[in-house]
Amino acid sequence: MMRVTKKLYALLIAGMMAVSLVGCQSTGNSSNDESTQNEQSSKGSTNSSTKSVSSDNIPDFSGNMTVAVDNNDPDFTSKDLTTKSYESYSRLDSEGRCQVAEACVGKDIMPKGKRGAIGMVKPTGWHTAKYDNVDGKYLYNRCHLIAYQLTGENANNKNLITGTRSFNVDGMLPYEEMVGDYVRETGNHVLYRVTPVFDGDDLVAKGVQMEAMSVEDKGEDTVSYTHLTLPTTPYV
């Protein structure tokens, strides 16, 4: 298990190329069934934070996958600390875009089975883009804000944004696995929040900010972070 001795609050910067594996699904299995995009309620708390992140605060991409921000401090308070597992997904905004997704990840809400199909969900900015020089061929993918491995949330349109393989695998996945491994190995809980960052009326997020903090030890000896991916559209 990957452990850190201080709170890690990182802004993930990813130049998006190719398709995603874990947390995202290739566009090749896209469905035309729009009726399955209806809003799904969370399995726990519904009081997700209205926290937002301004794209103005995101550093320009400099080739680095991650860059620390806000002194490595996640934005959770003592009142947020709870050992009761929950997951919560904000309502889509007026443009139909995902907003904040939040959870207290515990073993009791982690999935016991394999992830199901998510091709019926079409996040904002979605279209099929296929290139021979892209790994897996399909450039754009459906990316979970809160990974399936953490809460078992599958085809929820409040939890899926348009992204790419680099965005997911090189950026989000290491942190998702850090959280998942910690919870599975210790039985403790992790506060976890993912906030998409949109620039103006753009339908594809500029990135996502991810925060996590272990509850039982208040993040002092385990996992705590945030990261952001930029851009979710490829450089051309």
Residue ranges and their predicted role:
Residues 160-185:
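Short Cys/His-centered divalent metal-binding micro-motifs
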Residues 186-219:
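A motif-centric signal for short, conserved binding hotspots located
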Residues 20-23:
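C-terminal motif of bacterial Sec signal peptides marking the signal peptidase cleavage site
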Residues 226-232:
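Conserved small/polar residues in nucleotide/adenosyl-binding loops
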Residues 2-11:
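Bacterial N-terminal signal peptides that target proteins for export
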Residues 28-78:
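N-terminal, intrinsically disordered, polar/charged segments of Gram-positive cell-envelope systems
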Residues 13-18:
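Hydrophobic helical h-region of N-terminal Sec-dependent signal peptides
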